[in-house]
C-alpha cells in the first residue's frame, strides 16, 4: 500500500525541499521504496539531489502531465531519475509554470497528477511531493492525489499566522475533490533552541492548532550545514551523519513511519 504525502506551505524558505529529500532518503534507509516528485517550477529538489541543471532535462513532471492531458502513452519509468541514496525522482523545472497556465482550460484539471500517480504507485511504499510555494493549480493537483499533507513551518511568528489560509485550502480540497485527505502534521523548522522565541512559537502552534492538527514532537534545528548540502547533491545523512540535523530527520522519519 503506497502512502502519498505532499510537503506544502505557500510561504517559501521554510524547509520544504530539505524536508522532502531528507525524509524521503530517511524512509529509503528504513527499506521503503520511495519516489520523490518535484512539483516546483524552480526545480530546487531536483537540483539539490545533484541534477544541477533541471531546465535542460527533457522528461520531467511537466512533460508527464502534458502527456496525460494529450493522451500520450508513457512507460512507467518515463522521466524517472535514480539517486545514489536509494530513492527515485520525478524531476521538475521551469516548464511547470507554463503547464500551470495551460491547466486552466483542461477538463478535470485538478486530477492530472493523480492520473500519473495511479500509474506508478504500485512500485512504491511512499511518494513525497515537494510543492511550490503557492496555492496554484499544480499544488491543488498534489493535494488532490495525496493521502496527507506535511506542513513545514519556520519558527517565526508571521509564517505561523499564514497557516490559516493553507489549512482552509486543505479543507476545501478535502470537501470538494479528495475526501481521504488529512494533515500528516506541522513540522517546526529552522529552530534555534537557545532562544525563548522558538519555545514561544512552539507553544503558539500547540495553542492554535494542537487540538485539530498533529504537531510533530521533533523539530528541525537551524543549521548552516542544511544549506550547504543542497550544493553537494546528497542528503544530510551522507554529509553529516552524526550531526543534530541528521538526528532530527531520523526522528521525523520514525514519527512518519509510526503514523502508517
Predicted features and spans:
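P-loop NTP-binding core
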Residues: 1-260
Amino acid at each position: 500500500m503506497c502512502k502519498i504525502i505532499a510537503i506544502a506551505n505557500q510561504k517559501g524558505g521554510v524547509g520544504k525541499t530539505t524536508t522532502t529529500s531528507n525524509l524521503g532518503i530517511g524512509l529509503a534507509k528504513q527499506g521503503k521504496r520511495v519516489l520523490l516528485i518535484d512539483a516546483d517550477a524552480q526545480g530546487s529538489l531536483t537540483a539539490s539531489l545533484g541534477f544541477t541543471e533541471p531546465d535542460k532535462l527533457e522528461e520531467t513532471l511537466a512533460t508527464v502531465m502534458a502527456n496525460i492531458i494529450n493522451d500520450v502513452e508513457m512507460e512507467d519509468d518515463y522521466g524517472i531519475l535514480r539517486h545514489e541514496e536509494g530513492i527515485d525522482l520525478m524531476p521538475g523545472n521551469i516548464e511547470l509554470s507554463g503547464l500551470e497556465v495551460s491547466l486552466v482550460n483542461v477538463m478535470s484539471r485538478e486530477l492530472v497528477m493523480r492520473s500519473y500517480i495511479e500509474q506508478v504507485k504500485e512500485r512504491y511504499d511512499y511518494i513525497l511531493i515537494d510543492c511550490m510555494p503557492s496555492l496554484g493549480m499544480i499544488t491543488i493537483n498534489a493535494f488532490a492525489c495525496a493521502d496527507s499533507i506535511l506542513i513545514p513551518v519556520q519558527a517565526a511568528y508571521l509564517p505561523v499566522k499564514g497557516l490559516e489560509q493553507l489549512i482552509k485550502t486543505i479543507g476545501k480540497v478535502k470537501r470538494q475533490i479528495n475526501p481521504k485527505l488529512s494533515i500528516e502534521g506541522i513540522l517546526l523548522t529552522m529552530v534555534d533552541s537557545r532562544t525563548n522565541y522558538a519555545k514561544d512559537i512552539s507553544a503558539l502552534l500547540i495553542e492554535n492548532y494542537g487540538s485539530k492538527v498533529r504537531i510533530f514532537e521533533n523539530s528541525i534545528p537551524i543549521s548552516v550545514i542544511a544549506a550547504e548540502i543542497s550544493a553537494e547533491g546528497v542528503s544530510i545523512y551522507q554529509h553529516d551523519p552524526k550531526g543534530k540535523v541528521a538526528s532530527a530527520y531520523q526522528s521525523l522519519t520514525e514519527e512518519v513511519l509510526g503514523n502508517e
